[in-house]
């Protein structure tokens, strides 16, 4: 079976493969980030979003993989064989988990459309010959939000209220929810 874990989110393994392996933070850093930003939603019995579900599954898979690695470390007596297994897990499985964690954390943090736009931008940048591309790669956190807003058919929000409107005495409600209640 050829299963692409990103397909339902509009991405693909191939799209993420444009990012170099050293682009992705360590699994420990990604787990710490997921915990710091989304612990409540991840531990909640409620369904929050497909990204939360995918994050839960990736975290559980990594935990089981670490249990297996511990077992192999304890039961495989040949040091060379043990080193081969550890190296394979870190290089191949570790990278896949790092990609999964990064993708879903980024989608929850920046929004799926922004992450997909970033992946496409980076893919175009990396495939463009160095002589014809800008010196710096695109950066996820600096992509303009207006692209996403315009794609939905809205004009960018004004910075100042219209003089005809009366200001409400109550604080204005934010459109996005706080990180604590990410569902």
UniProtKB/Swiss-Prot annotation:
Domain of life: Viruses
Post-translational modification: Phosphorylated by host SRPK1, SRPK2, and maybe protein kinase C or GAPDH. Phosphorylation is critical for pregenomic RNA packaging. Protein kinase C phosphorylation is stimulated by HBx protein and may play a role in transport of the viral genome to the nucleus at the late step during the viral replication cycle.
InterPro entries listed in its UniProt record: Hepatitis_core, Viral_capsid_core_dom_sf_HBV
Subcellular location: Virion; Host cytoplasm
A biological-process GO annotation: microtubule-dependent intracellular transport of viral material towards nucleus
A single cellular component GO annotation: host cell
Motif annotated as Bipartite nuclear localization signal, chain positions: 158-175
Sequence repeats, residue ranges: 155-161, 162-169, 170-177
Function: Self assembles to form an icosahedral capsid. Most capsids appear to be large particles with an icosahedral symmetry of T=4 and consist of 240 copies of capsid protein, though a fraction forms smaller T=3 particles consisting of 180 capsid proteins. Entering capsids are transported along microtubules to the nucleus. Phosphorylation of the capsid is thought to induce exposure of nuclear localization signal in the C-terminal portion of the capsid protein that allows binding to the nuclear pore complex via the importin (karyopherin-) alpha and beta.
Name of protein: Capsid protein
Species whose genome carries this gene: Hepatitis B virus genotype B/C subtype adw (isolate Okinawa/pODW282/1998) (HBV-B)
Record gene name: C
